[in-house]
Amino acid sequence: MQKLIERLDFGKIKARGEMPHFLEFQLNSYEDFLQTNMSPNKREEKGFELAFKEIFPIESSNGDVRLEYIGYELHEAEAPLNDELECKKRGKTYSNSLKVRLRLINKKMGNEIQESLVYFGEVPKMTDRATFIINGAERVVVSQLHRSPGVSFSKEVNTQTGKDLFSGKIIPYKGTWLEFETDKNDFLSVKIDRKKKVLATVFLKAVDFFKDNNEIRDYFLEVKELKLKALYKKYSKEPEELLNVLKQELDGSIVKEDILDEETGEFIAEAEAFINEEVINKLIENKVDKISYWYVGPESKLVANTLMNDTTLTEDEAVVEVFKKLRPGDQVTVDSARSLIRQMFFNPQRYDLEPVGRYKMNKRLKLDVPEEQISLTKEDVLGTIKYVIELNNGEQNVHTDDIDNLSNRRIRGVGELLLMQIKTGLAKMNKMVREKMTTQDIETVTPQSLLNTRPLNALIQDFFGSGQLSQFMDQSNPLAELTHKRRISALGPGGLSRERAGFEVRDVHDSHYGRICPIETPEGPNIGLIGSLATYAKINKYGFIETPYVKVENGVALVDDVRYLAADEEDGLFIAQADTKLDKNNKLQGLVVCRYGHEIVEIEPERVNYMDVSPKQVVSVSAGLIPFLEHDDANRALMGSNMQRQAVPLLKSEAPFIGTGLERKVAVDSGAVVTTKVSGKVTYVDGKKIIIEDKDKKEHIYRLLNYERSNQSMCLHQTPLVDLGDKVKAGDIIADGPATKLGDLSLGRNILMGFMPWEGYNYEDAILISDRLRKDDVFTSIHIEEYEIDARTTKLGDEEITREIPNVSESALRNLDENGVIMIGSEVGPGDILVGKTAPKGETEPPAEEKLLRAIFGEKARDVRDTSLTMPHGSKGVVVDILELSRENGDELKAGVNKSIRVLVAEKRKITVGDKMSGRHGNKGVVSRVLPAEDMPFLEDGTHLDVVLNPLGVPSRMNIGQVLEVHLGMAMRTLNGGTCIATPVFDGATEEQVKDYLEKQGYPRTGKVTLYDGRTGEKFDNKVTVGIMYMLKLHHLVEDKMHARAIGPYSLVTQQPLGGKAQFGGQRLGEMEVWALEAYGASNILQEMLTVKSDDITGRTKTYEAIIKGEAMPESDLPESFKVLLKEFQALALDIELCDEEDNVINVDEEIGIEETPTEYSPQYEIEMTGLHEIDEDAEDFEE
């Protein structure tokens, strides 16, 4: 067995607690949704099971028929579609059949019971790499970060008055939003669904929390009783003082009960009236004994004011008032209004907080409503109103919420995203079933006849096939795959949109610490909206991201007590860094630097609550692979982590000398390498498979990938690392994959490089390389392209795959087999035929004499045209595989397709001028020149450098990590014949250690050495920093971008050449280019450019003729775009005509006489003279 790479670790902090599996969340989310490993009757109420239980039982409106749900089963697809690779090859979906067991109870037929298993459709199956194979393509469903349901409070300042206005939003998972808010007039109102506004007290009566206004006052205001007799006595001599005392006590309060004059029966004060000076004077005059009232203090003014403006007195009036706001213009009755409001807030089908919303609500308002209660309760509403009132009163123990805090944002995984779709589909199905129950004949009804599962299947297919969060997997290399699955997007359905997202949402937040990486996010319009999960982060059952900490008690770190905390559990805690110094008893020493909210404080050890588990926990996998990350500017680190994902797997991979210790875990968790599931002995090994026999003599077969094509046309190939007879343990690595070497992720190569200018060839980040990198295939990669052709049935007959192609020389067919398909191993170049195909031409009725001749000499071969599959321009390679699918062999193909052939062509690409390369620190550049190795600068021992980079690329970019990497790489290159090390992020090798290792290996401590010019052999004036840098070749290869056109397709209307490489287009000569030619007065060139080289149809045909015959150039005709301009004038209803010198009208609309199949076609030049490209209109199936 080959020995795996062992790294010398420079990390000083021992990690406490295990790093979770990098794909844990994706795999668990889908398993929780499907519960495949549970038997149907033992499944928990979550995911699919929950969705079915919410919809069933379905009962007909008259109660005669009832459809009940028993359970669902998942059945594996039949061979060969139960294999991932086969699904990919055949363009099929890797899925399970969903069958649901239902019970139909028919009361009309004397409670007759029918049980049956109904096929509901296909549910895609997740591979163990957390991907889905949909129509042959591997896809990933990205997790979504969205606003958590629950309640949140916010503050705004009124611009006119400068007054603070507060609001409390109750946000359900699904249903109507409620927002209680104060306004400048001190009223408390509620917005229903963010637009319809009513007074809060009206709403409270409408939802039947209170019967009338008095009940509301009893709840919010304090009831007091004042005995006046004693006061009359006390202030009998001082009537002024009496008035002041009563004013102070009663002014602004509300009378609770009517106060009558006992003799006359007249009202002294009416119930529900505000008490003012006039009322107080009446009380004194009439010597009223006592008064009971609702006390209105500053804290209850809001409710009292609102009630004063509330014109509704009863629940019925309130219900009607709310209904009028919700449905203005609709006919209103009390019952219909009440029913609408009940449905809106108290029907779990329409209003659903979900357990997470209930959890947040209970936590925020300090309630203890049971978690099963997912609709709105009285406690929720009153708690929210009370909190808004407390905020308005400026109380100490209340605060508004930060919407960008991760305690208010949660993750929806694959399972939950799919569940949302499925609930929608089932709801549609439910509606259809109810309709069918009323229309179908009750005597013959069966579960199958009632169900129409099409809407459900359409939604599942939509979600996986074209949903915003289901993405074509980035398969450039194992790291790209892994980070794609760990990506977190704030976009997508129910999320933000790029245009609406402001700066705050995108910014790094203190709650991201250890949860979302502050570095890895795309550059461009999505910055900050798409993030990546941090290395140690997990996601809890409510969807909040948690990060692990070590518990600290009385200044001692309990290193075995690792706890995962969500963002809201971290509030008010002092959390120390992972590198805090501990003594041998794990006691914290000295003053400790801690995080406290978004502040950094220094405190005594006894006050510390928790401590980080590892310095790595802050960053994502991609950023965690950058050595000396702590010495790089964040902007460059962002580029570095994004560019590692674009690295092309090389033909000869090599693990980095300077790693971070994450390389092995990435290789294993991404599924790039093959690990064994059992312990045992290797009994068979070759390039295609490895067989391991366990202790019970049972054989386990591990198939290896052989030159498979990835989504990004990279080559997926696995190589065994074990030999026959080797003993292996479960979890051992037995085969290397693409971009891995001996079990470690290996995206690039260790390159000897120097920082120096060289003849201007590294100006502006350009890279000068040695031709050794080409000769020794150092940066050579294999790319596999796929070319596909279908033979269809057309109106004129069947297309045929054949070797007999009209007007094609024998040499062009030399590599085709007898069926017209290219042979594996053939070398092909641009224009070569891969698959010969002919299509029938439209045939006219032959004349009588031809019919006679045909009758005598037999049927003449029908006229066919060549529609073969050829290699596109600029492509070359070797045919490595051919996949044939045909109806004859029983393969499923699209409608109208009889045979489908796919040809895989592999191409070796060496590094070349124009290719993009980079290091791991965001130091990217383009190869500017490939220099012969002997001309490159060389060291004193004669070793030539491989790469020369510009030293000016370092200081302004502030990514000094690359310099440290180069120095340490130089030392490790010669240590024990090449040593791989790990320098973990934020805990790596120090500057001193780097210098010590350089010295140990006989290099100066500065890391600078004398270099000699390879051309003259002379010393360079100054010493140069030379060392080993790990460099990557990126996916932006010049061969994919280079493009040239002579004659090609034209746009139909303007007749100008198309644009872009994909369309084989030309270079656009825009208005600025015209100005440039005008500035030179180059009138003839300008005329050619605008006519015969572009859209003058007759002119370009005649010009070609003139060139062929060697004649003088003809004059140009009218450009087609001029005619388009005339048409545009006419479309504006302007009558515009074109006249010649004699004022004769020129008819622009005259058709130019071009035949359908151009005769001016010269096969030997492979040039088509006209812009009329025939479209294959005979093909029936235009869906593609």
Curated annotation (Swiss-Prot):
Gene3D superfamilies: 2.40.50.100, 2.40.50.150, 3.90.1100.10, DNA-directed RNA polymerase, beta subunit, external 1 domain (2.30.150.10), DNA-directed RNA polymerase, subunit 2, domain 6 (2.40.270.10), RNA polymerase alpha subunit dimerisation domain (3.90.1800.10), RNA polymerase Rpb2, domain 2 (3.90.1110.10). Keywords: DNA-directed RNA polymerase, Nucleotidyltransferase, Transcription, Transferase. Its EC number is 2.7.7.6. It is an enzyme of class 2 (transferase). InterPro entries: DNA-dir_RNA_pol_bsu_ext_1_sf, DNA-dir_RNA_pol_bsu_external_1, DNA-dir_RNA_pol_su2, DNA-dir_RNAP_su2_dom, DNA-dir_RNAP_su2_hyb_sf, RNA_pol_bsu_bac, RNA_pol_bsu_CS, RNA_pol_bsu_protrusion. The keyword Lipid metabolism does not apply. GO terms for biological process: DNA-templated transcription. The keyword Metal-binding does not apply. Pfam families: RNA_pol_Rpb2_1, RNA_pol_Rpb2_2, RNA_pol_Rpb2_3, RNA_pol_Rpb2_45, RNA_pol_Rpb2_6, RNA_pol_Rpb2_7. It catalyses: RNA(n) + a ribonucleoside 5'-triphosphate = RNA(n+1) + diphosphate. It comes from the Bacteria. GO terms for cellular component: DNA-directed RNA polymerase complex. GO terms for molecular function: DNA binding; DNA-directed RNA polymerase activity; ribonucleoside binding. PANTHER family: DNA-DIRECTED RNA POLYMERASE I SUBUNIT 2 (PTHR20856). The RNAP catalytic core consists of 2 alpha, 1 beta, 1 beta' and 1 omega subunit. When a sigma factor is associated with the core the holoenzyme is formed, which can initiate transcription. DNA-dependent RNA polymerase catalyzes the transcription of DNA into RNA using the four ribonucleoside triphosphates as substrates. Belongs to the RNA polymerase beta chain family. This is DNA-directed RNA polymerase subunit beta. The gene is rpoB.
